[in-house]
Structures are given as structure tokens and as C-alpha cells.
Curated annotation (Swiss-Prot):
GO terms for cellular component: extracellular space; Golgi lumen. The modification ADP-ribosylarginine is found at R78, R88. The gene is DEFA1. This is Neutrophil defensin 1. Tetramer. Dimer. Interacts with RETN.
Amino acid sequence: MRTLAILAAILLVALQAQAEPLQARADEVAAAPEQIPADNPEVVVSLAWDESLAPKHPGSRKNVACYCRIPACLAGERRYGTCIYQGRLWAFCC
């Protein structure tokens, strides 16, 4: 029983250690809100990420433009995740 309690404590500490950097990033994003017109269905998002997570386009070394769109990505784009803006879910498309 003691071992189970120790393992649970270690797991909670590990999860908290991973959550702190995510909270710091969320705080940075929340600190700098952008003013975007409500009638604009397209939102341009600038993100910093690990290169290993970047979209791979064979034969292309150009920068990839990514957008948050409703309801879905346009033809030729691929969905890489979800954006949350003004309480709504958007497709993150590149």
C-alpha cells in the first residue's frame, strides 16, 4: 500500500511538471490578445513549435502558412489540430 502511494505521488509530480510549461505558454498567449474583426471568418495564427511537429511537404523548403478556419480546411490544406478562439473551436489548417 505504501508503494502504491509513493508511485501515485511520483506520477502526480511528473504530471504537474509537464503542466507548468503549458500553463506558461497559455499565459503568454492570453497576455497578448489580438483584435480581429468579427466578420472575418479567417484568422491568421503565428505559432512557435518544435521542428519535429512541423508539417512535412516533400520537395518544398518554403514557409508553410497555417490558419484557423471554420468549419474545415480548404482544398489543398491539411488539418493539424484545433484552435480555440472566442470560445469556438476552429480547424488548424496548413
